[in-house]
Amino acid sequence: MRQFSYVLLLGFVLAFIAFQARTGIFRRKNPGEPANKYMRQMMESPQLSEDDAAILMQKYPTAHSNPSGLRYVVRAPGEGAPVPAGAELTVHYTGAFLSTGAKFDSSYDRGQPYTFRVGAGTVIKGWDEAFATMRRGEKRTLIIPYWLAYGETGRGTIPPRASLVFEVELVDYH
């Protein structure tokens, strides 16, 4: 009789566990996501390819790095106050691919500077972030990772996940 009660108790326990699992009480809210916060952040934060990271360390070892992933080297300091929010900027630039160094665009070649409003979202995120801290006349080399440039899809002649290098000059703002 005693053995029968153990088997009966074990049966009830297994039935209870099966019922709980079936109703979803023990299910995670997001089963496809990692369980801990650190793993989730690592999966969500974009990373440079190994090739791009190697080129970056070789060509730009002294580049300043922002938390967003934007890197820059100040080539010539500017004068005056930093760009105010919402200012209209006049800039010259030459854009190239980090991976190959091939130039894809240049306002210098056209002989006409480019004008845009900082922070309005009309240019790539890396430009909005970089130009917001520059001063009139300043020249920088911007190393912009793909997630601050044209992203996972690319655009026009820019392929997907392309990290870019810009030689920029803040000519004026108002």
Tell what function each PLM region has.
Residues 1-174:
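Cross-family detector of peptidyl-prolyl cis-trans isomerase
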